[in-house]
Amino acid sequence: ILMLSSSKIFSYAGQRMAVACVSDKLFDTHYPALAERYGDSGVFGQTFVASVLYMITSGCTASTQYGYAEMLRAATDGELDFAADVREYARRAERMKKIFTDNGFHIVYDYDVTRPVGDGFFFTVGYGRMSGGELLRELLYYGVSSISLETTGSGQPGVRACTSRMREELYPLMEERMKAFRLDHPLS
């Protein structure tokens, strides 16, 4: 199953929207355990759509669906270079991560199995032995907002930072504040 999030691939800021791609073979496969669990035919595709997606999603307006479909069409027809549009987030993440790591922070999720995690909209940082909640609270005193990794289901201490609101004039300020953070929170 390949799930494509509109906010991740197109940086779409509207309603949350995604598409799930399932091969015909998987879609048409019968699983007795699914039939027993969901009380239906047990055919993966039917169960996935009618008993799983339907129950866990709230739906989306038709205009958003048509807009997302048009973005997908334009991308596959070569009219929309969506990768170029989101490269700015990678540039921001690279600069922000350097500021953090230059000041004693470490990247929590730097590898996906054996491959380095690419820079993008979000990245994760930790600091010493601080829990995610502690780090979140302390960063707020320095004007940095984040979310604790614990709220994302992670068992790792740290926070998730977002690049979306970063602007050129904020990098020097961030650098100054993270230097102050390091001085106020010496690592042993």
Predicted regions and their residues:
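Non-transmembrane alpha-helical segments in soluble domains
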Residues: 19, 69-72, 97, 101, ...
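Short, solvent-exposed loop/turn elements at beta->coil junctions and helix N-caps
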Residues: 6-7, 109-114, 149-151
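Conserved core segment of the aminotransferase class I/II
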Residues: 1-86
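Short, solvent-exposed loop/turn segments at secondary-structure junctions
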Residues: 7-10, 24-27, 73, 129-130, ...
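PLP-dependent enzyme catalytic core of the Aspartate aminotransferase-like
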Residues: 135-188
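Short hydrophobic/aromatic beta-strand micro-patches
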Residues: 21, 124-126, 162-164
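Short amphipathic alpha-helical segments
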Residues: 16, 119-123, 157-160
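Conserved glycine-rich beta-strand-loop-beta hairpin in the small C-terminal domain of fold type I
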Residues: 61-65, 69, 82-97, 101, ...
